């Protein structure tokens, strides 16, 4: 890139901007490059969750310690979450702490993407949008998904329903995964995640919306747009190679089980910046602080791939039973996410069979979780209620409603969406 003193970062997402902010504050010349027109441009106003149960320390306290201002973006806190069982029973997980923070992704001023962008610019970093650079010319690689391991489809809508979160485990509506309802200040999102590739995938979203409308009759939903997302889940042999730091999704630093990734994205950007500033060893710090959680999530995903609604029901029942005993709805789910010795053993046993080598990884030894095939139980026709939801969306689309995914294409195709799933 000409000037060896300058630090060039590929990707103006959360991990790249986090690193850029700390480096620029330390007096480094920092250039961030992104092929898109703005930070958050690959999202479309999607709501995403910052979970707060996998670690003892609150994520916003971590942000403060690292020097980031969380007031730069809108985050809505929840201490109650509807837990929806596969048999349609609705219970509530409650805590005296913060269970979730919901943030919006995209280019609006209040999004987390723009909040981190403003902090990077204020620190003195220069951001170059619509700028293509080569990986070998950059110090930090902070790109989004390249392959596809899972997808998510959602509908954003207007509603007069109060702020609310619902989290549903249902293998019929969300194969191998979950669906959710998020309502923030008059705008709602119903989303289903698919960890098995499907044909005519829009039926899963239609059926999921129909389910929520039947069980939350006061939604008063007016569709705005439909959005899609994909997740790319990888394990890297090296996180620093040939002088380059691979952060966030480029480093495979996210949750394989349910797709949470924003916390590790920011954290990995911080660790990369610290290494460059002589305050740490990125490879060692990633393996110490982040990889135990990633390996645990791989073991969890392997288990999730082998169960269905019967086990999902047991999980929901155990969660509520533990909450009744402990008085805190975060303890059970926190234990599921936190590293355990037996999950470390399970990871070593199953990862060779669960992950496939990526021949285009520039010698980094990247192994990717493939998008699993559909099962026989995934083949079904929409209900009348789902057909009505689809017809409602068709009417909204004719009036200008936009959609960011193809209706009938098989969901394994990368071109179906450029958004990211829960990260």
Where are these regions (language model features)?
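N-terminal FAD cofactor-binding segment of flavoenzymes
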Residues: 39-82
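Predominantly flavin-linked oxidoreductase catalytic cores and closely associated redox partners
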Residues: 110, 114-223, 231
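N-terminal Rossmann-like FAD-binding beta1-loop-alpha1 element of flavoenzymes
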Residues: 6-31
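FAD/FMN-dependent oxidoreductases across multiple families
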Residues: 75-77, 202-287
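Active-site flanking residues adjacent to catalytic metal/cofactor-binding acidic residues
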Residues: 10, 33, 247-249
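Active-site-proximal substrate-binding core of FAD-dependent oxidoreductases
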Residues: 274-315
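Glycine-rich FAD pyrophosphate-binding loop
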Residues: 24-46
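C-terminal auxiliary extensions adjacent to catalytic cores
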Residues: 311-410, 414-423
């Amino acid at each position: 890139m000409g000037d060896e003193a300058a630090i060039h970062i590929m990707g103006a997402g959360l991990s790249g901007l986090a690193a850029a902010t700390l480096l620029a504050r330390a007096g480094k010349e920092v250039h961030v490059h992104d092929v898109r027109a703005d930070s958050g441009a690959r999202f479309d106003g999607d709501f995403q969750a910052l979970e707060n149960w996998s670690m003892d320390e609150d994520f916003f306290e971590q942000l403060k310690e690292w020097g980031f201002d969380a007031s730069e973006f809108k985050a809505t806190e929840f201490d109650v979450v509807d837990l929806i069982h596969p048999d349609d029973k609705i219970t509530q997980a409650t805590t005296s702490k913060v269970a979730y923070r919901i943030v919006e992704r995209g280019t609006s001023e209040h999004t987390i993407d723009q909040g981190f962008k403003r902090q990077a610019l204020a620190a003195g970093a220069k951001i170059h949008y619509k700028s293509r650079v080569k990986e070998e010319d950059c110090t930090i690689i902070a790109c989004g998904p390249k392959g596809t391991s899972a997808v998510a489809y959602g509908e954003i809508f207007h509603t007069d329903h109060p702020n609310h979160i619902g989290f549903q485990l249902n293998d019929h509506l969300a194969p191998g995964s979950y669906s959710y309802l998020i309502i923030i200040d008059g705008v709602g999102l119903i989303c289903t995640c698919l960890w098995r590739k499907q044909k005519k995938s829009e039926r899963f979203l239609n059926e999921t919306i129909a389910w929520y409308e039947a069980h939350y009759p006061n939604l008063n939903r007016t569709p705005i747009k439909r959005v899609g997302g994909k997740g790319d889940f990888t394990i890297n042999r090296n996180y620093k190679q040939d002088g380059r730091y691979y952060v966030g999704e480029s480093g495979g630093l996210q949750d394989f089980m349910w797709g949470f990734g924003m916390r590790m994205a920011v954290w990995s950007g911080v660790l990369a910046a610290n290494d460059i500033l002589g305050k740490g060893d990125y490879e060692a710090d990633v393996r110490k602080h982040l990889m135990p959680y990633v390996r645990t999530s791989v073991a969890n995903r392997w288990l999730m791939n082998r169960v269905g609604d019967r086990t999902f029901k047991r999980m929901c029942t155990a969660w509520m039973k533990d909450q009744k005993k402990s008085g805190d709805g975060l303890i059970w789910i926190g234990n599921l996410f936190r590293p355990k010795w037996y999950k470390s053993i399970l990871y070593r046993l199953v990862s060779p069979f669960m992950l496939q080598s990526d021949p285009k990884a520039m010698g980094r030894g990247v192994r990717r979780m493939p998008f699993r095939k559909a099962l026989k139980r995934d083949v079904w026709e929409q209900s009348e209620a789902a057909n009505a939801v689809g017809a409602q969306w068709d009417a909204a689309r004719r009036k200008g409603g936009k959609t960011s995914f193809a209706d009938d294409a098989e969901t394994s195709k990368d071109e179906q969406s450029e958004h990211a799933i829960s990260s």
